[in-house]
Structures are given as structure tokens and as C-alpha cells.
Swiss-Prot record:
Source species of the chain: Dugong dugon
Stretches for region Disordered: 191-218, 233-311
Molecular functions per Gene Ontology: alpha2-adrenergic receptor activity; epinephrine binding
GO cellular component: cell surface; plasma membrane
The protein's name: Alpha-2B adrenergic receptor
Length: 390
């Protein structure tokens, strides 16, 4: 029964991790640099399923080490290498999640395939540094027990403690602290909301922003309706009461134009009022007549020179002396980019939560082994661990 279950787990591990590697390498949507961690982690798990678990199963079923002594030493080193690599990979992934959430804009620009590969290489070097000492330093071999040969891990206290700390306890502590920090960041940003960071605080007066002040300037730019309202009132053409009330009720928080932006001059400044605007210069009157022309149908003064304008998507409108000027798509595109970054941050948090659950289960599965393994070095005489539990 045990052999059947373990064999099924071996096949399931190989099949599942192979699908992960194929999905990352073939799917265009999964070719993000951080997914290279998953490829390397899946490769380590496949190595465990093919090179470690079958020999461990044979050793448990037979009750002794059937294979050669040299392969026993290599087998133990590979066991520590692949298992340590899996755990340190999870630690590296948690750090990658933390940097992506806490410093999204700065870290995402640095998250290149070359940088991720360097981190993966560092992970494997750490695992190799922990697994190779038993192959290099044999230590006191002692008399070989009579009977059937056994293949056991290094029993020296210094190696047991150092390998346990480096392979499990230190990465586990790092992952717990990192995910706790990520949880606090996600909780704080959820309370604050996506736009609270750039908004004014209580007691602070709103200052006019320039057009190149980035995505935060979107909230301070006038909308199409507010710009037309300001231009109409400056020309002496006020909006109908119903329209004005509706506009005010729909957008009570729309900011007015900053003083640095030009608006149409007031008709009460000694200028003539006209259908197309007001000016003291005859040339301006001539231009206005040319621009407006004779209306084909009777129209109100407020709409004779201001026909319905189609606002380009992603643009803003600014009232000027010549009418309305559509600003470029730069600000709108910056706003869209800002929202895409916020959506990416939300996905990072969601993926972090799922990954935290997976790592939590992984840690709970590994803790009994490393705890019982460490007890053999701390108190070898009084802390006897049952062989079946180990």
C-alpha cells in the first residue's frame, strides 16, 4: 500500500511540475521574468521525485541500503541539495513578492531575466554549500556496524545544526517575516485606496498643478463640461439653471481652472459682447465672423460658436481665447498607465496570498522532520526520537 501511494506521488510530482515548466516556457502570458523561479523550483522537485524518492522508498521497504556505498554518499548529498534548493527557492520567491509590493515602480524596472537568473544561481549555490560538506569532510567514520549496510545522514552535531538552520529554520523565519510585512502593506494600502496617496490631506490647500506633474495631476484637470461652463460664463453666456444644477450635482468636486491658465476675458471689462465672443479689435470681430459664419438654423448665442465637440479619448479640454483646446493624450495615457500599475499591484497581492498558503503547507510538512533531526544533535542521549516518526 505504501509503495502504491508513493509511486502515485512520484508520477504526480513529475507530471505536475513538467506541466508548470511547459506552461511557463510556451505561454506568452507567463513569460514574465519572475516565473523563472517557478521553472527552477519545478526542476528541483522533479529531481527529488526521480533521484531521491525511489531510492528512499527502496531503502524503507528493504530495511537496508541495497546499493553501493559511493552512491549512498552521493544520494544523501543530492537529497540535501534538492530539498534545500526547494526551500530556498520559496524564500527567494517571497522576497521577490515583497519587493514587488513594497517598491513596485522601482523594482519592476529592475526585475530583468538576467537579475532573476542571478538570484536563482545564488539559490543553487547556497544549497550546494550546505550539501557538499559531507562529501568533502568525512569526519570520524567509526566502526561499521555488522549486518546489512545502512545509509543515513551525517550524525555529527555541527553539521546537523548548521544544515538544519541553513536549509529550513533561517528561510522559514525570513518567509514568515516577509509575508507578515506584505500583509501589513496590503492592509494599509487597502484602507488608503488607490488615489489616497496623491490626494491632499486635511488642512492643506489645493495648489494648481502643471500639466507635466504626472498622473496625480489628473484629479486637478478640468473636465469637458467644467471647461465649457467657465468659457461660457466668461463670454457672458451663462448656462441654463437646470443644466447648471445638473452639472453641479453630477460633479460637485470638479476643480476650477488654475489662475495660470488663460480664460476668456469677462464681458464686463468694457468689451463688446457678440455672438462669437467679445473684443475691442475690429480684426477680432472679423475673425469671429469668419469662424462662425451665418448659421443655417436659428441658434442661441451660447451655441452659435460652440458646436458640440467630440472629445478625443484620453484627452482633457482647456478653455482658451480661441475656444477649447484638447490636450494631448499624454496625461490620459499616464493615468491609464497609473491604473495599470495599480492593477498589477493588486494581482501581486492576490498571488502573494495564494503563495503564502502554499508555503504555509510546505513549512508544516517539513517542520516535523527538521525538528526531530535537530533534536538528535541537541540532546542525543535524552531526546530519543522514534524511528517510525523520523
Amino acid at each position: 500500500a505504501i509503495a502504491t501511494v508513493i509511486t502515485f506521488l512520484i508520477l504526480f510530482t513529475i507530471f505536475g511540475n513538467s506541466l508548470v515548466i511547459l506552461a511557463v516556457l510556451t505561454s506568452r502570458s507567463l513569460r514574465a521574468p519572475q516565473n523563472l523561479f517557478l521553472v527552477s523550483l519545478a526542476a528541483a522537485d522533479i529531481m527529488v521525485a526521480t533521484l531521491i524518492i525511489p531510492f528512499s522508498l527502496a531503502n524503507e521497504l528493504l530495511g537496508y541500503w541495497y546499493f553501493r556505498r559511493t552512491w549512498c554518499e552521493v544520494y544523501l548529498a543530492l537529497d540535501v541539495l534538492f530539498c534545500t534548493s526547494s526551500i530556498v527557492h520559496l524564500c527567494a520567491i517571497s522576497l521577490d513578492r515583497y519587493w514587488a509590493v513594497s517598491r513596485a515602480l522601482e523594482y519592476n524596472s529592475k526585475r530583468t531575466p538576467r537579475r532573476i537568473k542571478c538570484i536563482i544561481l545564488t539559490v543553487w549555490l547556497i544549497a550546494a554549500a550546505i550539501s557538499l560538506p559531507p562529501l568533502i569532510y568525512k569526519g570520524d567514520q567509526g566502526p561499521q556496524p555488522r549486518g546489512r549496510p545502512q545509509c543515513k545522514l551525517n550524525q555529527e552535531a555541527w553539521y546537523i545544526l548548521s544544515s538544519s538552520i541553513g536549509s529550513f529554520f533561517a528561510p522559514c523565519l525570513i518567509m514568515i517575516l516577509v509575508y507578515l510585512r506584505i500583509y501589513l502593506i496590503a492592509k494599509r494600502s487597502h484602507r488608503r485606496g488607490p488615489g489616497a496617496k496623491g490626494g491632499p490631506r486635511k488642512g492643506e490647500s489645493k495648489q494648481p498643478h502643471s500639466l507635466d506633474s504626472g498622473p496625480s495631476a489628473l484629479a486637478n484637470l478640468p473636465t469637458l463640461a467644467s471647461s465649457l461652463a467657465v468659457a461660457g460664463e466668461a463670454n457672458g453666456h451663462s448656462m441654463p439653471p437646470g443644466e447648471k444644477e445638473r452639472e453641479t450635482s453630477e460633479d460637485p468636486g470638479t476643480p476650477t481652472l488654475p489662475p495660470s491658465w488663460p480664460v476668456l476675458p469677462n464681458s464686463g471689462q468694457g468689451q463688446k459682447g457678440g455672438v462669437c465672443g467679445a473684443s475691442l479689435e475690429e480684426e477680432a470681430d472679423k475673425e469671429e465672423e469668419e469662424e462662425c459664419g451665418p448659421p443655417a438654423v436659428p441658434a442661441s448665442p451660447a451655441t452659435a460658436c460652440n458646436p458640440p465637440l467630440q472629445q478625443p479619448q484620453g484627452s482633457q479640454v482647456l478653455a482658451t481665447l480661441r475656444g477649447q483646446v484638447f490636450l494631448g493624450r499624454g496625461v490620459g495615457a499616464a493615468g491609464g498607465q497609473w491604473w495599470r500599475r495599480w492593477a498589477q499591484l493588486t494581482r501581486e497581492k492576490r498571488f502573494t496570498f495564494v503563495l503564502a498558503v502554499v508555503i504555509g503547507v510546505f513549512v508544516l510538512c517539513w517542520f516535523p522532520f527538521f525538528f526531530s533531526y535537530s533534536l538528535g544533535a541537541i540532546c542525543p542521549q535524552h531526546c530519543k526520537v522514534p524511528h517510525g516518526l523520523f
